[in-house]
Amino acid sequence: MGEIPVRGSGEGEADMQAGDPATGVVIATLVLYKLVLIAIGVWASRLNRNESDFFLGGRGLGAWVAGLSYAASTSSAWVLLGFSGFVYVYGVSALWMVPGIWAGYVGVWLWFGPRLRAETAERNYVTVTDFMAASAGPSTRALIAILAGGLVLFTFVFYIAAQFGAAAVAFESQFALPHTESVLLGAVVILIYGLLGGFWAVSLTDTLQGAMMALIAVLLPAAGLVAAGGPVQMWATLSETMPSAYLDITGERGFVPFLAFAFGVAAIGLGTFGQPHLMARLMAVKDEKARRTGFTIAMSWAVLVYFGMALLALSGRALLGEIFDPEALFYEMANLLLPAVLAGVVIAAILSAVMSTVDSLLIAASAAAAHDLKLIRLFPRREVMISRVVMASICVFAVALTLSVDATIFDRVLFSWSALGAAFGPVIAARVMNAAPKGWAVLAAIVLGFATTVLFYTYGQIGAEAAGGGLSGMLARLAAIPGDPFERVVPWILPLVLVFSFRQPRPVEDRRS
């Protein structure tokens, strides 16, 4: 089938010009949504009295807020746009990613959750770095905080900038807004409610976003399935129009290539265990009952949304055939299947989801700078004010990067999910499993996990031919294996071996079951 233009190009752009009813609905929906976000920020501002309130919501998150805000922070627009596009391209074999992602939910909430919540509350830890460095001596603990805070700040500033860029592209394509205005519009609204309300505002707005995403993940895939003629007809269409590998669970790969691909895409879930903004949700949940209920809510959301997006991808392939940009599938299907006004509402929700990805990252990056790098110690009893100044500074810097640095640079740093996961995840896992790694081992594990991810990512970008022979050629060939198992798994294994090999006895009173 031929390519169907999206709104913002060709005839689609004409539909969204000023005066078109859908355009008015999109703008009205966005304005209303942003006003709600700002109102939440104003309301939540009265809850911020100290550093713990601003970065952890006073450790008072209930089950629904914790569960839905975690889910939205984990996936946000990525699952609607990126995951659906991935399944659209690779077919049924792409679904091997899903068990790994779901396993990440289970591991964080049921394995990490009990100890992480209890110990961080008891000892008043503000960031996950405090938890990682607990077994180190004072001087080494300070080095761990500086290293971890610096890595979070570096990767998240670039990731935030990438999200601002993605939001800008969406605004440009939908409303023909200039690039600078598009970036500033998203940044200003996020900064306002984040500055006012801190973690509470971010969690509440992410809860709203998570609920909206779940609703969309039901409505649009259902419309797609009906338009494709139902599940039987959809499968028959794909069988006739696509290569047989598209509907094969292995992608018709050989046994070893299939294992590498499935293992690699499933290992995306490993990155979950080292994300500071996700660990913060577990640290902030108010009690064990809320944690258990929050897991049920988050897991139900994940099953619903990932199933819906997989269905959307397959029905979209049956309906549309080949399209220019797979990550535009969601927009394509909304424009094709829904009335103009309703499609406008859906697109407005996606634009909001793209921008709302940033808020949790901003809080985590601000915590890294203000708490881990000890900036708040320069101004005693001004913790909230300093945290807000840091957040504003990070946002301004990210906006400047968005406007001045080539977008391809942003693409190269989107590996931060795997890099931070490999840097922090093994150390957190060791602490959760009652190990007390020596301080220097924690430092070395963080460096090793991050550096190994960078190594394989870099060689994957270079390619085997450009790398030549010898060790470089071998690393490039390993990095080029479909599914990227060496980029996602090896950087986890090496630090894990390190922290378990160099442990110190824990005092009896510090041991937990």
Tell where the protein language model's regions lie, with residue ranges.
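Membrane-embedded helix-loop-helix hairpins and adjacent transmembrane boundary segments
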Residues: G12-S513
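Short, Lys/Arg-enriched N-terminal segments with co-localized hydrophobic residues
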Residues: E3-D15
